[in-house]
Amino acid sequence: AMLAFAVLLMPRGDKRRRARALGAAACVLLGVGAYLGAYADEAVYGRTANDALINIWSDNEVYLSRGFALSFLHSVPELFPEKPEGYDARAAQALLESFPDEDIPEGEKVAVMGVMLEAFCDLTDFDALAGFDTVQEVYAPWHALEEQSLSGRLLTNIFAGGTVDTEWGFLTGASEHDEYCGATGSYVRYFTAQGYAAHYAHPGYSWFYDRERVNDYLGFDRSVFTENGFGELVDPYVAMWHSDQQLADYLLADLDAADGSPLFSFAVSYQNHGPYAETESTVPYVSPEASGWSQESCNMLNNYLFGVNETVREYVRLTQELDARDTPVVLVLFGDHKPWMGNGGSVYEEMGIDFDTSTLAGFRNYYATPYLIWANRAAKEVLGADFTGDGGDFSPCFLMTRLFDACGWAGPGYMQLSRAMRDISPLLHTNGLFLHDGVLTSVLSDTDRSFYRSWLAVQYYREHVAAYS
């Protein structure tokens, strides 16, 4: 039909103008109808899947497997992100510029190292597991490290997946984000503007979550993945269960190579990625006899705990290695989300965990992960702070802010704005939930709601409008 109408558009003299106009109008109507019909239909898009022939975790392979035309037209809405309510670019720019960037004092430019731990949570937070000595033993070194650190809980947006939501919240300070399509505001850019090198490491593939491209948009100088470094250190398949040793060693070597020059390094671990086998397990941390739970649930818990046991000890070793160095280093460790534990959270359900997210207790059970901010002796001396105590609970977008607070740094203007937002609510959840005076709520006062809208406008401006070199 499109070809037939195209013939009508071919130039054949003045007498054909009306026919060409009708053909053009028909093509437009047909095209719009096709787009609003089949091309925009999620069910049609779903039926074009070729999952058996591709890696379903690769966005590029998914895109190509469904055909360029369908994939492109289906992605058109991503090219036009929705602006926040009442968005005014000039007002957002003016608000952001009213908070000027503050430099890190020259004598205080300590190395900053961050590690986001895959599916890391403290299972002793759950009463159902806290009573097992075997489980307590797994987390005992972590609890000891918390006593030496500022520590608390991240109140994430995600459960059992979507790891980059927490990752990018930490790196950008944004409580929500759209698809990154170009250079965007980030704390990475602040570090490089302060004379830091900015390095990224992940013992997995660069195409996962399109991290290689996004990292360039965030401002990293260098990103190392399986394809350009870690593949020589650990097999990417094995890395899902055993790679924290290699990652910790890599971070130490990278720090040493900087030779005292300011370095911001950030790593995303891969060890303990789900799913966890339910047919067998090596170490019986929990058993059906002791717990009353099914063998399948116990196996999943045991396999997760086996990996976490190694993870905890590797990052305790990392702190010991850092403490033995003269280079001042501040380290932040945090989990991205709770681990997958069976379809529909079957293991959690069998354990009787409260996941009613309308209550604060259930919300924390579902979304909270641990974090700690630790400093070696050299950094404590340089910064004049002890880095211990209760760090508070908050959204991932406030974690870098808390780190700067601990260091005594004012930071970039956006971070100063974030402190004002955090004072209103340390929780900014994508489900529209806040934490006000310790109460989980979807309601803010008119004044606080107005500031929150301004905050969202600044985020949008910073991500989509502001220019970055």
Range-by-range predicted roles:
Residues 93-107, 114-117, 122-469:
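Solvent-exposed soluble domains appended to multi-pass membrane proteins
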Residues 1-109, 133-150, 181-185, 309, ...:
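N-terminal secretory/membrane-targeting segments
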